[in-house]
Amino acid sequence: ADNRRPIWVMGHMVNSLAQIDEFVGLGSNSIETDVSFDKQANPEYTYHGIPCDCGRACLHSTKFNDFLKGLRKVTTPGDSKYLEKLILVVFDLKTGSLYDNQAYDAGTKLAKNLLQHYWNNGNNGGRAYIILSIPNLNHYKLITGFKETLKNEGHEELLEKVGTDFSGNDDISDVQKTYNKAGVTGHVWQSDGITNCLLRGLTRVKAAVANRDSGSGIINKVYYWTVDKRQSTRDTLDANVDGIMTNYPDITVEILNEAAYKKKFRIATYEDNPWETFKG
């Protein structure tokens, strides 16, 4: 058996359909997409805006539902646009524009959009796993709204494909408390990181990995962002993360192919369950 750790190579800030092909072509098996909301808490655009990572164009933008339709095509086996390698999508939900009391509505509206335009109302929709990444612990009701909507619409089975992440670099203990409040018991990724324009140590990522490996924490997988340089990629792998978010997936793949890393890590495939803690 192959007992190497599966790695998700997460293409950062993929906000146009052309960029999906570009990043997967460079070696990503996963993408991160920014989602902006209108004043009524409807997901509106895949859009990051200024400022963004150094060396990247910040203004790529697609109507959210058009992005979902294109994403469905590239993750539906048999479609002419199908990309077999793309197995996971992180929606970086820009809920900072919303009031805290709109979080539930945002979750509801997000679920309805995904159900219709990505999952094709449960009829042979896209197959990728989805992570809802939320920047603010106070917005945990987004998860509740999302889950209750899929249940009410008769598609609870799709929750098998959905996980969550709180991306605000909060104390791990506070993240754990928030998940308790939200009634979340699994499918948890934990991110840690900072824009590539700045440096950040691995202290908190190591704390997240320790929680993951303790057997008593809530975290299943840990990813670190944004990792663009060869040495920082090696350091991140040495910390035993599960995912590396990058602007340069070809560099991540290059390091994964170095002898020292090739024996411990491999690129995740669709058969790898992203909600399962790796036991090595």
Swiss-Prot record:
Domain of life from the UniProt record: Eukaryota
Subcellular location, record wording: Secreted
Cystine bridges: C52-C58, C54-C197
Species annotation: Loxosceles gaucho (Spider)
Listed GO MF terms: lyase activity; metal ion binding; phosphoric diester hydrolase activity; toxin activity
Enzyme Commission designation: 4.6.1.-
Catalytic activity: an N-(acyl)-sphingosylphosphocholine = an N-(acyl)-sphingosyl-1,3-cyclic phosphate + choline; an N-(acyl)-sphingosylphosphoethanolamine = an N-(acyl)-sphingosyl-1,3-cyclic phosphate + ethanolamine; a 1-acyl-sn-glycero-3-phosphocholine = a 1-acyl-sn-glycero-2,3-cyclic phosphate + choline; a 1-acyl-sn-glycero-3-phosphoethanolamine = a 1-acyl-sn-glycero-2,3-cyclic phosphate + ethanolamine
Main location class: secreted
InterPro entries found in the cross-reference section: PLC-like_Pdiesterase_TIM-brl (IPR017946)
Keyword Lipid metabolism: yes
Family: Belongs to the arthropod phospholipase D family. Class II subfamily.
Catalytic residues as annotated in Swiss-Prot or TrEMBL: H12, H48
Tissue: Expressed by the venom gland.
Name assigned to this protein: Dermonecrotic toxin LgSicTox-alphaIC1
Cofactor: Mg(2+)
Enzyme class, spelled out: lyase
